[in-house]
Amino acid sequence: MLFRRKKTIMRLCRILLLTIILCLAISPAAAYTITEFCADGYAEGDGDEYFVLDGKGSLASWSVTDGEGTVSFGGESGRTVVARNGELYYQIHNSYPDLEIIDSTPKVPNAKVSKKFQMANTEDGLTLLHNGAAVQSVSWPDDVEKGNGRVHRFENGVWDTRVFKIGQSDFEPRTFTADKVTLFVSPDCSHEVITGVIKEADDTIIISMYEFTSVSLAESLADAERRGTEVTILMEGGPVGGMSKDEKGVLNYLSRAGVDIYTIESEGKLPARYRYLHTKYLVADSMVTVVISENFKDSGIPKSGSGNRGWGAAVEDSGVAKYFTEVFEDDLAGYDIYSWILGTEQFPEATESDKAVKVFKPKTITNCEVTPVISPDTSYLIGDALNNAKSSIDIQQAYISHYSDSENPWLSSAVRAAEEGAEVRIQLDGMYYNTDSEADNDEIAADVNRKGLKNLQAKILTDREGILKLHNKGFIIDDELVLISSINWNYNSPTNNREAGLLIESEEAAEYYTNVFNYDWEGVVLDNPASAAVGFDIRFILAGAVIAGLVVLYIWRRRH
């Protein structure tokens, strides 16, 4: 009996050993993968084209072919970057590859190449071989979409889960529990919140901004620099229509005050990493992060109280501040960054509107969850939030446009939520440039309303006292989730721009912005414990007078 047991144990041991040997024998077939490549680079002759192998163990038995030439390996192991020209790769990526195909620099070893290995831009393919047998293949345009500067990534068994361009970041989403968040809106109270943060900063202020022409904010930042606060600003160098004379004057003024200013922009044939730096945020003292939908302009952050409708939040949390600082530093480290060159443009004169309507005051809430949203890295969080909506969605957008080959997916998600029973309201800007063409806000609103759902409405904001235009890019979902962002609802903004936003999970935050939304929707503050003395709106006074007059007339007639 004992002998049989020993024999059985020995048999099991032999089976286990054989299984281990087989696993070791077959594991190399899955040990390496092509995880990234760029066939159409920015350097001359596509010298910066490259591919990346990821895995463990020796690469000696591995090779990559494009169907014409083959790259083989020696003693390399682990993640290995193979570029066509190491020096040109360095000029674009600011780091050298592990191997190069063309001998360009002694800093990079040469790869073993047979015949001509060069990826074609429009139609080609790569095949990974192990001991001469194919284990992975990818081709374009069949498997991935071709394009200049397109970087293709293989993650979780799928190619290109998002559009990547050379030099773009890949930040993961993180959620923080913020100690304190101050909610505010433009035009009512954004200026006081932002200047307050600037005035309280002692050590550092970093700003990432699309446009900057505000005289008062420039003066506040210059004062901060003079008192010893280190101020650094990153600007979009080529906004739509070009950088204005006033903006150049503001940046000259700040530069003379000692502020470090940089621009991100295309240069010649070398495109910037992002179509536009469209962000609007600042971080003070590595602790307070301000994210807003508005640019630093008199219309966006008005001192007088009259201007664009926009939403913002100042988050007091070191984790959120660190996250945005890392994004800022990544943006500042790219090949497309240029120091500001002092020009002759003069500091513009301050302009103030004679209309000062301040309906809403800032409101501070505590202990709420905050998730940064960064485009193009984590734009998908917006779609996820819309797809998870259950009871209500209030959307306030400067504009919504469909994609060239499909409907806007975020709008489709909102409509689908309404079809499933959620109350959905969509408010869009009514300025002429958002309503003049044949496929802009008024057509979008009409299409939404034509669906005939009582719980789905779309409106155009055309007239609210003190509001010049609707420039917001936010929503409120299920009375508990708020989006504050710079992200427009088009293809380019979430896909190609650098953008910034916040998802705030808080019933108090949702209530605050719902009150603002209701005011814009109906012209009435339904419930706003955070509002200032709302003041008297002449429209309501007149309406009340008319009603009172009718009541008096009715009573008089009854008595006579």
Question: What feature does the model see in each segment?
Answer:
Residues 98, 103-116, 122-123, 131-136, ...:
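HKD-type phospholipase D/PLD-like phosphodiesterase module
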Residues 549-560:
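C-terminal membrane-anchoring or membrane-association module
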Residues 48-56, 125-128, 151, 205:
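Buried hydrophobic-core signal for structured, non-transmembrane domains
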Residues 68-110:
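Intrinsically disordered, low-complexity Pro/Gly/Ser/Thr-rich segments with frequent PxxP/GP/PP motifs
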Residues 1-11:
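N-terminal secretory signal peptides that target proteins for export/translocation
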Residues 527-544:
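Juxtamembrane/start-of-transmembrane alpha-helix segments at the extracytoplasmic/lumenal side
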Residues 16-25:
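Bacterial N-terminal signal peptides
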Residues 30-70, 117-121, 213:
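A structural motif detector for short, solvent-exposed N-terminal "entry" segments of globular domains
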